[in-house]
């Protein structure tokens, strides 16, 4: 697949911003990064690294690949021009060690010349604290071996991270005094209107009132996300049920994940309607986005309910998965492949419908909760 992608890039060109793509099958995972070759060239420059077995790799929209060794074909692939383009465009002098991210990247989200940002650092450090990784470093490994085995629900949790309760929590200084119920005593708590997805205008206003009240960090779960996926590949099962895409619309920190199997033949009609440009009740994304945005009005009063709903569907998906796998194989044996895939299609549709109903009900409830003012 990677070589075909490379051939297509060479033939037709790549004209977008730099991009990272993950190429995976049940046996291995490759990390593929690509850039354009310049305004006057049809082509592109790319490199791909195999993530070692038992490792977790992290990329969050900045180049991460460092050493490129085309001779190590078991673990590395690259376009034939990977070094030549860097020299021609003045990105690399050909003398110091070549680092792909340094040659072709423009720094991280903070403008620092690093091979990582806060998101990569946070996840890698959380998975392998024994490595004692430092944010002050110039480069972090593209992958680490976690200190303990990582489950699919661990990955879901990492994609929903807002750094709550850590030193990177953007709400940690937004505290108010609250009188305890049935007591004259007061307690200091995070303001219920504080949330990790505050707009730039809100952050600027708060910092104008009190300097450094909010220190902004790029979150793993960003509110402008259209959708996110956790892809689970199991080689001991038939491909149709062994491959599962756990998809979440909108903010990964606020939405449930819906199982879409490789054997799922079709999706609900609302999944086929784009809701990115305007509000549309017939677009699936708005079944979630409306409640998610309303919840941030008083996140302190809504987050427990929303997190409980996410946990409900996470548990439902994981608890029912073994039954779905077993039932698929049973139908496959008794009725054939088409009937088995129809079963998976129906399961995905039913699961999606249940999540959308829950989020629509929450959205209605939040409107009622805030009807007299936000």
Tell me the role of every PLM-derived stretch.
Residues 6, 17-19, 26-29, 44, ...:
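C-terminus-biased signal that marks the final domain/tail of proteins
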């Amino acid at each position: 697949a990677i070589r075909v992608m490379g051939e297509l890039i060479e033939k037709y060109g790549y004209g977008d911003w730099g991009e990272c793509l993950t190429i995976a099958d049940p046996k291995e995972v490759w990390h593929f990064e690509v850039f354009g070759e310049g305004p006057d060239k049809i082509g592109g420059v790319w490199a791909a690294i195999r993530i070692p077995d038992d490792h977790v790799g992290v990329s969050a929209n900045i180049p991460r690949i460092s050493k490129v060794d085309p001779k190590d074909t078991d673990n590395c692939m690259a376009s034939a021009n990977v070094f030549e383009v860097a020299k021609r465009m003045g990105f690399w002098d050909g003398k110091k060690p070549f680092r792909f991210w340094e040659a072709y990247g423009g720094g991280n989200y903070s403008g620092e010349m690093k091979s990582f940002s806060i998101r990569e650092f946070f996840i890698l450090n959380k998975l392998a604290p024994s490595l004692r990784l430092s944010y002050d470093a110039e480069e972090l490994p593209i992958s680490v071996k976690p200190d303990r085995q990582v489950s699919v629900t661990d990955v879901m949790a990492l994609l929903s991270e807002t750094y709550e309760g850590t030193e990177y929590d953007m709400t940690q200084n937004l505290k108010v005094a609250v009188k305890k119920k049935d007591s004259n005593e007061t307690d200091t708590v995070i303001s219920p209107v504080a949330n990790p997805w505050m707009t730039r205008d809100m952050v600027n206003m708060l910092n104008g009132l009190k300097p450094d009240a909010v220190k902004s960090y790029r979150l793993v779960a960003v509110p402008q996300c259209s959708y996110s996926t956790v892809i689970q590949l199991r080689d001991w099962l038939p491909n149709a049920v062994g491959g599962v895409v756990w998809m979440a619309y909108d903010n990964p920190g606020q939405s449930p994940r819906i199982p879409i199997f490789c054997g799922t033949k079709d999706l609900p009609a609302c999944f086929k309607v784009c809701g990115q440009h305007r509000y549309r009740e017939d677009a699936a994304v708005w079944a979630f986005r409306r409640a998610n945005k309303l919840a941030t009005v008083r996140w302190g009063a809504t987050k427990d309910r929303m997190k409980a709903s996410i946990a409900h569907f996470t548990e439902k998906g994981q608890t029912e998965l073994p039954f779905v796998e077993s039932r698929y194989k049973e139908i496959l044996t008794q009725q054939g492949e088409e009937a088995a895939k129809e079963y998976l299609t129906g399961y995905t549709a039913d699961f999606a419908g249940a999540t959308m109903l829950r989020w629509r009900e929450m959205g209605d409830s939040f409107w009622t909760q805030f009807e007299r003012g936000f």
